[in-house]
UniProtKB/Swiss-Prot annotation:
Chief place where the protein resides: cytoplasm
Gene Ontology CC: one annotated term: cytosol
Modified residues (N6-(pyridoxal phosphate)lysine): 427
Cofactor(s) recorded in Swiss-Prot or TrEMBL: pyridoxal 5'-phosphate
Name of this protein: Probable cystathionine gamma-synthase
InterPro entries assigned to the protein according to its UniProt record, in alphabetical order: Cys/Met-Metab_PyrdxlP-dep_enz (IPR000277), Cys_met_metab_PP (IPR054542), PyrdxlP-dep_Trfase (IPR015424), PyrdxlP-dep_Trfase_major (IPR015421), PyrdxlP-dep_Trfase_small (IPR015422), Trans-sulfuration_enzymes (IPR051750)
GO biological process: one example: transsulfuration
GO MF assignments: cystathionine gamma-synthase activity; pyridoxal phosphate binding
Superkingdom per UniProt: Eukaryota
Location in the cell: Cytoplasm; Nucleus
Disulphide linkage map: none
Length: 610
């Protein structure tokens, strides 16, 4: 069995272990039983204290926690003598200000209680104080990090912004900040020792060779130097093994250009980032005239793409109008539409009957700013009637934003029917479950194109950390091929589940009542995607199936390996009745099918159902 196959078919099983196993920047966590999922939601220490990783918008990673601990000890922070204060970390001043504004708008908090601190500037100040001429620290690059400090009693409100927007710093950015800090500290100690040696030399040159303090300092400096060299060799080795090259700004810039071209559908073949990039080719995937990589914008997460799309639309359209969430979209999408702007109308079922209701609302004179939907939706895999929605948008003047994460542009073509398409690159585009990212694609044929494009030129910040971009580029090179394998495997499993008497409902685009709407956008060689959900006749069967199935079990989707979760428990534990009213059974099990050998997967599901 090859190493790759072994990695796919031997999932981690220990509560709290990372998914993938032993991965520094893993974005999922093992919750192997139904009980452990409930325990996580209820804060059971038997679960929470064992968590080595978690989904990054819900779980503060160890690297980020370490950054927070260090920044709290910076002189500029310590001098404030703050008591009972917490902080979140962001990659730009603009995002930090947005976080502060959200805090002040949602809680009874005085603006003076919210402090924005440039942690990068603070670390540079320390660097300059020890090595002003940069003799020893010339090559140290400190990534941009801002901290937003606030009284601990407002932690819940502050976390809402961090979670919903997805604009917190990534674990790789945090790790780089920590590495810079440790390097500067080591150099600082080295220079102190060097000055001590110089002082001792000047005081007693004749006793230099035998002075015990001086000998100790020389020994310390030698050890520190060797340790520093070893650390740098380890880092270089890691980068060479992981990327086959050293990371630098020029490669990151090239990687981001490749990503944008790949997402625009104008780059089919792999490229060498160290060589000149080929000119942008013609469309081979997207079917929108005039589309180029200049219409693609990258973000640190998928939710950041959605949040910023909504933010830009509020600036260029009529912000006094509400938005529409059509269909049961991912929880944070709805929260963004509800908590920013003028609110939203929620059509949770997202079916033709609710589209009739929406049309009647428009006919009555109600005006809306934008309609947000997923194609298909998560976790019910329903497909809205995009053709009809486009006609309504043209008639009643509102923007259409489609999240294509689940369908992905290998399988479906939704951009011609949308003004903006967003996606989480964290999912199948990456596949490796070790990096976050998001994208926004503008439709050049949209009536709002010029306004949105001008606003993006003025306000867009590239906050996708360079190393994250390099990781995404590497992971996504075989995106199209992986999608086809996963399409095949998912259909194979659905054919198996569809015939099983224990299954009450199978949710999959091929079998859903909204199939005709999916087919209207499906590419000629496209499949139905890798995500499916099942509801059992007997809730106990759902729990037994989840506990027994031998696949990775935790949050997220779109992974190269099969990943299962009791979706309603994880995403809506505090609002299960409300979720049920919108079609989400509390015992629903969601499965993201991976690239394991088909026969292996069939046996895994047969055993879990037996």
């Amino acid at each position: 069995m090859s190493a790759n196959i072994s990695y796919l078919v031997n999932p981690p099983t220990e509560v709290g272990s990372s998914i993938p196993a032993d991965t520094e920047h893993a974005i999922s966590v093992t919750l192997p039983t139904w009980k452990s999922n409930v325990g996580y939601e209820e804060g059971d220490p038997n679960v929470t204290t064992k968590m080595k990783s978690g989904y990054p918008r819900f779980f503060i990673s160890a690297h980020v926690k370490d950054c927070i601990s260090i920044i709290k000890k910076f002189p500029e922070i310590e001098i404030l003598k703050l008591k009972d204060y917490d902080m979140f970390l962001y990659p730009s001043l603009s995002v930090a200000k947005q976080s502060a504004a959200f805090l002040e708008s949602k809680g009874p908090i005085d603006s003076a209680e919210v402090i924005i601190y440039d942690a990068t500037k603070g670390l540079r100040k320390h660097l300059d104080s020890i090595d002003r001429n940069r003799k020893y620290t010339e090559e140290i690059h400190i990534p941009q990090v801002y901290s937003v400090l606030f009284p601990s009693k407002y932690f819940g409100i502050a976390k809402q912004f961090w979670q919903h927007t997805g604009d917190g710093i990534s674990s790789r950015r945090a790790a780089a900040f920590l590495h810079s800090y440790k390097k500067i500290q080591s150099i600082s100690e080295f220079l102190v020792a060097q000055r001590s040696i110089s002082h001792l030399k000047s005081k007693s040159r004749s006793r230099y060779a035998s002075h015990p303090d001086l000998q100790a300092l020389n020994t310390w400096m030698t050890n520190e130097g060797n340790q520093a060299n070893d650390e740098m060799e380890d880092v270089s080795l890691y980068l060479e093994e992981r990327y086959g090259r050293n990371l630098d700004l020029s490669l990151a810039t090239a990687a981001k250009l490749v990503l944008r071209r790949r997402i625009a559908g104008t780059l089919k073949d792999e490229v060498d980032l160290q060589k000149a990039l080929p000119k942008e080719g013609s469309q081979y995937l997207r079917e929108v005239k005039g589309l180029s990589h200049d219409d693609v914008f990258l973000f640190p997460t998928g939710m950041s793409a959605i949040y910023n799309t909504h933010r830009i639309l509020r600036l260029v359209l009529d912000d006094s109008r509400k938005s529409v969430c059509f269909g049961f979209c991912y929880v944070d999408t709805l929260k963004i539409l509800q908590k920013w702007g003028s609110g939203c109308y929620f059509y949770g079922l997202g079916n033709d009957e609710q589209l009739d209701e929406f049309e009647k609302r428009l006919e009555s004179g109600e005006k809306v700013m934008a309609l947000f939907c997923e194609f298909p939706s998560n976790p019910l895999l329903n497909s809205p009637d995009l053709v009809r929605i486009r006609k309504l948008a043209d008639s009643y003047d509102f923007a259409v934003v489609v999240d294509e994460t689940i369908g992905n542009f290998v399988n479906v073509e939704v951009l011609p029917l949308a003004d903006v398409v967003v996606s989480s690159l964290t999912k199948i585009f990456s596949g490796d479950s070790n990096v976050m990212g998001g994208s926004m694609v503008l439709n050049p044929s949209s009536r709002y194109y010029s306004r949105i494009k001008d606003a993006m030129k003025a306000l867009y910040e590239d906050l996708l950390y360079d190393e994250d971009a390099l990781t995404l580029e590497r992971n996504s090179r075989d995106f199209a091929e992986r999608s086809q394998v996963i399409n095949h495997n998912a259909e194979t499993i659905c054919n198996l589940l569809y015939q099983n008497p224990k299954i009450k409902t199978l949710y999959y685009p091929k079998y859903n009542t909204s199939k005709e709407h999916f087919e209207a956008c499906r590419r000629e060689n496209g499949g139905y995607g890798g995500l499916l959900s099942v509801v059992f006749h007997n809730p106990e069967d759902a729990r037994q199936f989840y506990d027994k199935i031998q696949v990775a079990k935790g949050p997220s989707l779109g992974t190269n390996f099969t990943l299962a979760s009791p979706y309603a428990i994880l995403a809506h534990y505090q609002e299960l009745d409300w979720a049920g009213e919108n079609g989400i059974d509390r015992n629903l099990v969601r499965v993201s099918v991976g690239m394991e050998p088909s026969e292996h997967l069939k046996n895994v599901f047969i055993n879990a159902l037996s």
